[in-house]
Amino acid sequence: IAIKMLDMGYNAVVLRYSLAPVTYPAQLFEAAYTMKYVRDNAAEWDVDPDKIIIAGFSAGGHVAGLLGTGWNSKRLDYLLENVLHCSHEYVKPDGMLLGYPVITSGIDAHRASFERSLGEKYDEFIDEVSIEKRVDKDTPPAFIWHTCEDKTVPLENSLLMVEALRKQEIPFDYHVYAKGTHGLGLGTRETATKNMGHYEPQVSSWTECFKQWMGVMYE
């Protein structure tokens, strides 16, 4: 996906975020650090510091959502003041790209994702990390896509996110495809499995839709 973004004319930075035994809020901290790192190097890398989108797919979508909805949270106060030495606004994404994202810790949760990110702190933080409950008027715009047939991370996850964005009047594009399992990536041969699983040509249109959304929102 990062290579596809480069091909489309965007810069791409990949974060390999931590999982158990390293637990939340490490993922939020790592996302914030990465946002600062990109902005710090924006001039050298030819990046527009006002058009930085945080992207994530499946559990990665949850990490993207953590920063998109938590850049202004007190959870980041110590890190920003004493380690990164920057403001909350400096680590705010300008937008979010969420593909078949893990959003809710409620009835439609993908429990395994939360077990890996929370570890022994599961009971302590499970309510705090339900992304749809964190959306506020300062949450950045979002491009979201999902499939009806996703049995791993149910469609209800993105539906809850869209509903939360709508209530706060945050702009979003939302694309739901009729066919396709979880983890499709680009939906093309490049991200298909050896037996051509995860090959869904109709889903591959999401990249062009994303490009159009970028043009509308940020150019």
Question: Where do the PLM segments sit?
Answer:
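Conserved serine/cysteine hydrolase catalytic core
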Residues: 131-139, 156
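A fold-wide structural signal in alpha/beta-hydrolase
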Residues: 6-16, 53, 173
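Catalytic nucleophile-loop/oxyanion-hole region of alpha/beta-hydrolase
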Residues: 1-2, 13-49, 200-202
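Primarily recognizes the serine-hydrolase "nucleophile elbow" in alpha/beta-hydrolase
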Residues: 33-113, 122, 126-127
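Acidic beta-to-alpha connecting loop that harbors the catalytic carboxylate
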Residues: 148-151, 179-181
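Short beta-strand/loop motif that positions the catalytic acidic residue
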Residues: 138, 143-146, 150
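Conserved alpha/beta-hydrolase "acid-adjacent" motif
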Residues: 151-160
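C-terminal catalytic histidine-bearing segment of alpha/beta-hydrolase fold enzymes
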Residues: 159-219
